[in-house]
Amino acid sequence: MRRRRGTPLGVSWTNCVLLLATGLLVVLISVHAKNPRPHRGLPAPAPAPVPASVDQVATENAHRREPTVDGSVLQRLSGSDRAVDEDEDVDEDEDEGLKHQHLEHRQQFDAYLGTIRRLRRPYRSKYTIEQLMRLHVTPKVSGDIDMDPCKAGGFMGDIALPEGDSGPVVAHTPIDDEEQERQEVEQLLADSPSPVHDPPSVSGAANSGPTKFNATFQLDLEKLKQEVYHEGLQVEEEGLTDIIRKKTKLPSSGPVNLKAGQSQSQSQSANEPVKPGSESPSDYAQASSYKNEVLPPSEQRIHTDKPARLTLAEIGPKFSNKTQSLHRNVDTRKIQSDNKDIEDDSGNNFVAERRPSQIVPTSLPEQRSTPAHVYSNAGGNGMQLDDEVDFLHSRGVVRRRHRRGPKQRRSNQHLEHEVKLQRLREELSRPVIEAHHHQSHHQKQAQHRQHHQSHHRKKHRRQQQHHRRRGQSTTQYVNHSPPGFNQSQQAQQQSVPEMDLLKAETSKDEEPLRHRVARAVTAKKERIWDYGVIPYEIDGNFSGIHKALFKLAMRHWENSTCIKFVERDPEIHPNYIVFTVRSCGCCSFVGKRGNGPQAISIGRNCDKFGIVVHELGHVVGFWHEHTRPDREKHVVIEHNNIMKGQDYNFNMLSPDEVDSLGMAYDYDSIMHYARNTFSKGTYLDTILPIEMKGRKRPEIGQRLRLSQGDIAQANLLYKCPKCGRTFQESSGIFASPSHYTAGALSNETEHCEWRITATYGERVELKLENMNIFKSNNCETDYLEIRDGYFEKSPLIGRFCGKVDKEVIRTESSRMLLTYVNTHRIEGFRGFKAEFDVVCGGELSVDDAVGRLESPNYPLDYLPNKECVWKITVPESYQVALKFQSFEVENHDSCVYDYVEVRDGPGQDAPLIGVFCGYKPPPNMKSSGNSMYVKFVSDTSVQKAGFSAVFMKEVDECETQNHGCEHECINTLGGYECSCRIGFELHSDKKHCEDACGGVIEYPNGTITSPSFPEMYPLLKECIWEIVAPPKHRISLNFTHFDLEGTAHQQSDCGYDSVTVYSKLGENRLKRIGTFCGSSIPPTATSESNALRLEFHSDKSIQRSGFAAVFFTDIDECAVNNGGCQHECRNTIGSYICMCHNGYSMHENGHDCKEGECKYEISAPFGTIFSPNYPDSYPPNADCVWHFITTPGHRIKLIFNEFDVESHQECTYDNVAVYDGESESSSVLGRFCGDKIPFPISSTSNQMYMVLKTDKNKQKNGFTASHSTACGGYLRATSQVQQFYSHARFGNQDYDDGMDCEWTIAAPDNSYVQLIFLTFDIESSENCTFDYVQVFSDIDDVYGQYGPMYGQYCGNVLPQDINSMTHSLLVRFKTDGSVPMKGFSASYVAVPNSGEYDHSDEDVENSYSSEMVTPFPGSLKSIYIEDTQEETDEYSDFSGNQLVFNGQYRGRYSLPKRYYSGKA
């Protein structure tokens, strides 16, 4: 046999290498075999670790190495492969042997590499457990707080403080009793705020003991309250839904939860709003792809008594399992608004048409000629319960209504008046001492006496004021006289200048009841916007209809003042406002802050015309009217009726904070509070105008339009010229003040300003006629200056003087500014007359900025018979990009009436891109060249709100320039975005990529840290970690550092940045353990399975140092044979405990259960229950169960009448627990003990489960309770057909009078609800106005309003079957006080969306999106489609999802009707 040269003893070099590799592999495998755990762990921490600095830890980490394969071994192994291939002298037998050995070792090597890859974990931690346990991190905070009005220090605008520390998050029940609510709130909140100008006192906060606030919270609260006092924070109640609910005695969305038997003031910081074991229906979540599926509630909960973090040495075999839970309260009673007696805004809105008008000059800017003052009332009206109310409707009809209060209030009206009058005398007689304003007690008395000196003078003054108020017209005077007509008398008759009214009111002939005082506007001149120009931006999250609403409110301010709201240009507008949504609801800063963008938040319940106008008033520089220093002469504050903790909203401002503009107190101001703002109840007054004998108390708190005082005040604040006005019409005629009165010579200088505003895409054409102005050198002294824009720095078109006639001037933009100065009026120079027209169409171009295009008259309805053609061009080598932001054009299948036509080129013969109409915004589009043709056409009838669009130059930046993206570049319309590959995520610079946070961790112990820890975490970050332990194990998470955004006075639900911990119960089932924020260390969290999920979220402002946590696993003894427990086994750290079902008691052996004799099944709709032996003591070791069940679609209400159960801070000994469902596995509504009667409790479904458990010591008398039923609730539609009924005794008796019930029926995503009425017998009436059933498309998730209505039904004919357009429906049943009938029954089922028809809003011809929810003046549109055969045919393919009941085809309901009434 031939042998290779140089190979001794017959052993080849290849075999040697393979033998060495095999030995190395054996050694590595033996090392791994020493660890019996299936997952590689980290070394245990050393006891009593010494804190280490971040730099020390970083140095240690620099020397850490990940396990790798020796490079020389790889080289030798790969080299052996080549050695075999290169040897040409090996014989065939040896070749076969070597190849076999090589293949065998190659397989072993591949297996080894596979082992290395499997052991390489997808998540890389920065720290070991030892390092993390001894790491000390200093908390950090970023400096971007000013943009968010809810978070900004020194905030100046509308926002409210919290009512105090909310206490531990434990059992809670709805508050239905007003007295109990009052007592609870008084115990929860601080005793009283500091005086306005006193320094904060926090000495008692830190040493207050367990019944006082947390010291840190008290410091924060006092600091913020001082900002309120010194900075003048102002509050709007409309956006604070929790306060509205409390006023109407509804449960709060963020309830204050109390342990039974515990003092309410024993509180927990809001930094820990949700504790482990605090369960609610929202605690059960889905994995991201199944987040809307139904999750069955789990009975297992986690609770800890240790609020601070655990050290490793403290983790012992025992761990508390006591459970306290949150409760999501459901009540079908609606929230009553402050203005419930004012007509609903959906019926009082109408479009202000543009029409040519000839305008008479006035000394103050006048109101527009269109009736633009009839708008929705979104604020409180402040009317007295028995006041008469006049309503102006869209046709100009005045209808009078009487507000009616409770009978008791009517009967005691005289007594109440005497009480309030006496209280008023005490208020006026009490001395008031303020910084910068001291007034003696005798001066107060003297002023009080002056108020009652002369009865005939008061009567005369009241008559004058009455006539002046009636003379304030809500519409502008329109003159149709010929040009030669002398109009001086007419101008005098039209209106009296506001300043003249003020002078007359404060003349020497009257007592000083309303002297010249400080008006509620800012005294800080730096907060006044330069040139009266307020730039704005609108968040892209708002719908087109909301953007139109904001523009309409801004136009309302422009129409009456010289203030201009303009789209922000980054090059010239460093300071600007941003319309956005913040958690504070309706809030804004007062005036200009001067540090860049400032937010104006239009949140839930704030998207009403009057409220937006009000918030813009704060932007302009207005404070609330009732905060004036002289307010005690005009209103009385009822402090006893103010919600506890909201008194600071009624503090007076000092004269240093407001300017003296000589304006009288304005009860009619849109900036005035309503009478019951922040009251404890809807019918309690917090602020009342002073009532003078024989004079009706004025109304306050209107949110309809700017008052005459608001207009005059704004014009004074911004030094608006006394003559001139703002035009928003499509055409008009105006003239200088002396044009028609040349004979009335005067040496007074005329200074006027006219502002003509059109929409984007329109231009202004002005024709000067009969101009006769003194001709000075370069027109320096007397002139008419015309600018192409909105302020004095806009491009100058020309300055004119002398004589000019028939001069035509055109703008390139959509605005024109005219400034007129006449100093030679005495010499008979008449000035000028002008006529303007607004024309649409023309050539538009854009270079670097973004261009805008709107339909004529937007946001109001476009005009009839319009044809506008725009040619849009951009520089060469670019394309034109067009994006519609809102779109509402008369609909037609072929778009033959009104339409928008877009072509790919400069002319009408260019290739057609599309013709669009209807309500769905067209898709984004771009041209192939550098030009685009856009044409808008309207016919003679049916005008809609029109469209708003932006255009820009477009190029593929990813191809043509150095985009700077580290991984991938994605081209977008008008720009580009960077993207990262899988496993990475985008850095905050939006270009570079970094390792993605989160991941799956399969280790028995380890660490988790927030991104960039210990540095500040990034903005807008979403991280998810999943820790997976071996089967039959549990995972515990212990936080070692915690510093997230969130303080007690900013939030209570971790709405900004948060960490949420879930127990993963299955592949797609999650149960929330807790949600945490702030700086308090969360308690240890333990999973209920072998998987635990951690989610981290950060918002777009304010960063902190983040968090760090250690996790470890523990075996679950309950996983094997249920731990030997007969009923329930609950795992604890290092051990387990056995528990019995309700109605059973534990056997002496600690594992078995024996049956009890205290079980009750209750199905009666009404009744009373008692504890065993009541009124004697209940027995020891009792385990009693009451199971309530009622008619489907109704809920159980439980009211305790007497209650006396052994007391304990955590109700450990004896307790009564109430569950929201059929067993104790349902969510907990409350756990009670002690002798305080619990609050009334309501279930969310038709079942309730109550348990009484007692121990062997100390028995009490027990309880008695009444149970009843309530209609309405939340129904979950599934694939199984379910039913619900109109009233609890359906089939046995008629429904009750005065019912108002709501059912929300929700189906899973990608499904719709099919609602079928099985029986129907409702009192019949015309238009169904007495008793009726309404069906809506659910309630808007953001703003809490009804969606589009499918129909309103009555009579005894079955309504058509209804299929929801979305995945939910809302059914409302309302009855009056007479003629009850049998009621109705209905079935509902969830039907998956078929491929034939998509129920999304995008595919519906008449879009029922959220944009149609909020009506406002000028865009109120009918959301109902006529049930024509043509429309029915269009949806005829619905037959794929038909249902059959009782052998009858029920069909499908696809088109909504407004009313349906019929009889068999």
Swiss-Prot record:
It is found in: Secreted; Perikaryon; Cell projection, Axon. It comes from the Eukaryota. PROSITE patterns: ASTACIN, ASX_HYDROXYL, CUB, EGF_2, EGF_3, EGF_CA, ZINC_PROTEASE. InterPro entries: BMP_1/tolloid-like, CUB_dom, EGF-like_Ca-bd_dom, EGF-like_dom, EGF-type_Asp/Asn_hydroxyl_site, EGF_Ca-bd_CS, MetalloPept_cat_dom_sf, Peptidase_M12A. Glycans are attached at N214, N321, N486, N541, N559, N747, N1005, N1038, N1327. Keywords: Cell projection, Developmental protein, Disulfide bond, EGF-like domain, Glycoprotein, Hydrolase, Metal-binding, Metalloprotease, Neurogenesis, Protease, Repeat, Secreted, Signal, Zinc, Zymogen. Residues 40-99, 179-210, 248-349, 362-382, 396-419, 434-497 are annotated as: Disordered. First expressed in the dorsal part of the blastoderm embryo. During germ band extension, expressed near the mesectoderm. During stage 10, three faint lateral spots of expression are seen in the thoracic segments. At stage 10-11, also expressed in optic lobe precursor cells. During germ band retraction, expressed at high levels in the somatic and visceral mesoderm. During dorsal closure, expressed in the cells that will form the corpus allatum of the ring gland. Residues 34-519 form a propeptide. Its cofactor is Zn(2+). Residues 84-96 have a biased composition (Acidic residues). The active site is at E615. Binds 1 zinc ion per subunit. Residues 279-291 have a biased composition (Polar residues). Changing S669F: Abolishes ability to cleave sog. Residues 1-33 form the signal peptide. The keyword Ligase does not apply. Disulfide bonds join C562-C720, C584-C606, C586-C587, C723-C752, C779-C801, C840-C868, C895-C917, C958-C969, C965-C978, C980-C993, C997-C1023, C1054-C1077, C1118-C1129, C1125-C1138, C1140-C1153, C1158-C1184, C1211-C1233, C1271-C1301, C1328-C1354. Residues 519-721 form the Peptidase M12A domain. One of its GO terms (biological process) is defasciculation of motor neuron axon. Its EC number is 3.4.24.-. CDD domains: CUB, EGF_CA, ZnMc_BMP1_TLD. Metalloprotease which is required for cleavage of sli into slit N-product and slit C-product, ensuring correct slit N-product-mediated longitudinal axon guidance. Also cleaves TGF-beta family ligands daw, Actbeta and myo and is required for normal guidance of motor axons to their muscle targets. Cleavage of daw enhances its signaling activity. Required during mid- to late-embryonic stages for defasciculation of motor axons. During pupal development, cleaves dorsal-ventral patterning protein sog which contributes to specification of the posterior crossvein in the wing. This is Protein tolkin. It comes from Drosophila melanogaster. The lineage of its organism: Eukaryota, Metazoa, Ecdysozoa, Arthropoda, Hexapoda. The gene is tok.
